Curated annotation (Swiss-Prot):
Organism superkingdom: Eukaryota
GO CC entries: nucleus
Gene: GATA2
Location (main, coarse): nucleus
Protein name, as recorded: GATA-binding factor 2
Organism of provenance: Gallus gallus (Chicken)
Cellular compartment(s): Nucleus
Matches recorded under InterPro entries: TF_GATA-2/3, Transcription_factor_GATA, Znf_GATA, Znf_NHR/GATA
KW DNA-binding (keyword) present: yes
Any single Pfam family the record assigns to this protein: GATA
Biased composition (Low complexity): 139-155, 174-188
Tagged with keyword Zinc: yes
Length: 466
């Protein structure tokens, strides 16, 4: 036996349990199906479908489902590999709607992974109008997507098949009351709802790409241009880290100006101070020094002892040497030429004898001893003129002192009080919510974890999440 070229070999026509010919359900698709050799008895229906479930072979009613399943299987195999989850509905003879319905499982057996959660279940109008048609999602309407079959298979699989892994629906018992026949009046509304679901899915995938960036970057970009407020399906983890990673004051309105310090405020670095506590110079016993050094054995030295040891190669003496008397008041010293005992600077002549500053300079310049007739009782000093650099530095210091006095006397416009008064009108900044998405809102909202959807979801999406 041969199967149609547009379907895999494992996808064959199911056993019609209600005694009707397949062409009565699908008049235009009779050539795509194989006529079964014989019909299965009603009591072997469960065994037949359990056998299909055990082999993992999905079963479809029309070619639209088959093409969507093949294209989705190829795309999903590249994404998930061997970790693909294949949940299925458990069928048992004890379920009343299986026993009472002559059509058993309608025209086909649904696999939740082949059905788009953003659309309704049957895609073919005849399948939707079958008397035994059963919806996987109880809250969905089978007639809402009756006109989707007008789409081409390529465009349908490209727009509806998932841009992200789907959420497997819960195992629910279909509601027989939810089935209804497709009517021309409802087809227009179904087409509009399906278009809305397509737009919602595309914008949702784009929003998830934007959310993959860092939280701070996404928050800054959302301040400039408000993106759509789509949220990921609640079964997946949030894309924003936990609240403890960032302080709540960062997104608090009062933290921008004059409010409590945010989590990014640099903390005072007291590590160096805490590490230096308890150190003591092994030479002089000092505990405070601008720079700690080490000797050859690794012991700590203060800056003074370390420099002395580095320059002289020996330890710095603990007792400071006495300061020598000034050259002018050196006891027992007199000039060998003029016999004076007071001078600003003691010098030595060629013989090594001490001479006063005047006699030493005179001998240095004229190579003769200074005559005694030039000796004076007082020491003549020169009135040196101040250089330009010293004048500028002095003027700068005086101007700084005057400016500081003026700042203390009068309230400057740069004072803290004036700055606070200027900051007060800035309180109209829009508050920010501390939820998963950071969006500027005109009115404050409570920082709760509840998800508010900006666009109405299809009923199947809401039912799957519920």
């Amino acid at each position: 036996m041969e199967v149609a070229t547009d379907q895999p070999r494992w996808m064959t026509h199911h056993a019609v349990l209600n005694g009707q010919h397949p062409e009565s359900h699908h008049p235009g698709l009779a050539h795509n199906y194989m006529e079964p050799a014989q019909l299965l008895p009603p009591d072997e229906v469960d065994v037949f479908f359990n056998h299909l479930d055990s082999q993992g072979n999905p079963y479809y009613a029309n070619s639209a489902h088959a093409r969507a399943r093949v294209s989705y299987s190829q795309a999903h195999a590249r994404l998930t590999g061997s970790q693909m989850c294949r949940p299925h509905l458990i069928h048992s003879p004890g379920i009343p709607w299986l026993d009472s319905s002559k059509a058993a499982l309608s025209a086909h057996h649904h696999n939740p992974w082949t059905v788009n959660p953003f659309t309704k279940t049957p895609l073919h109008p005849s399948a939707a109008g079958a008397p035994g048609a059963i919806s996987v999602y109880p809250g969905s309407s089978t007639s809402s997507t009756a006109s989707v079959s007008s789409l081409t298979p390529a465009s349908h699989s490209g727009s509806h098949l998932f841009g992200f892994p789907p959420t497997p629906p819960k195992e629910v018992s279909p509601d027989p009351n939810s089935t209804s026949a497709a009517s021309p009046s409802s087809s227009a509304g179904a087409r509009q709802e399906d278009k809305d679901s397509i737009k919602y899915q595309v914008s949702l995938s784009e929003g998830m790409k934007m959310e993959s960036a860092s939280p701070l970057r996404s928050s800054l970009t959302s301040m400039g241009a408000q993106p759509s407020t789509h949220h990921p399906i609640p079964t997946y983890p949030s894309y924003v880290p936990a609240a403890h990673d960032y302080s709540s004051s960062l997104f608090h309105p009062g933290s921008f100006l004059g409010g409590p310090a945010s989590s990014f405020t640099p903390k005072p670095r007291s590590k160096a101070r805490s590490c230096s506590e308890g150190r003591e110079c092994v030479n002089c016993g000092a505990t405070a020094t601008p720079l700690w050094r080490r000797d050859g054995t690794g012991h700590y030295l203060c800056n003074a002892c370390g420099l002395y040891h580095k320059m002289n190669g020996q330890n710095r003496p603990l007792i400071k040497p006495k300061r020598r008397l000034s050259a002018a008041r050196r006891a027992g010293t007199c000039c060998a030429n003029c016999q004076t005992t007071t001078t600003t600077l003691w010098r030595r002549n060629a013989n090594g004898d001490p001479v006063c500053n005047a006699c030493g300079l005179y001998y240095k310049l004229h190579n003769v001893n200074r005559p005694l007739t030039m000796k004076k009782e007082g020491i003549q000093t020169r009135n040196r003129k101040m250089s330009n650099k010293s004048k500028k530095s002095k003027k700068g210091s005086e101007c700084f002192e005057e400016l500081s006095k003026c700042m203390q006397e009068k309230s400057s416009p740069f004072s803290a009080a004036a700055l606070a008064s200027h900051m007060a009108p800035m309180g109209h900044l829009p508050p920010f919510s501390h939820s998963g998405h950071i969006l500027p809102t005109p009115t404050p909202i409570h920082p709760s974890s509840s998800i508010s959807f900006g666009h109405p979801h299809p009923s199947s999406m809401v039912t799957a999440m519920g």
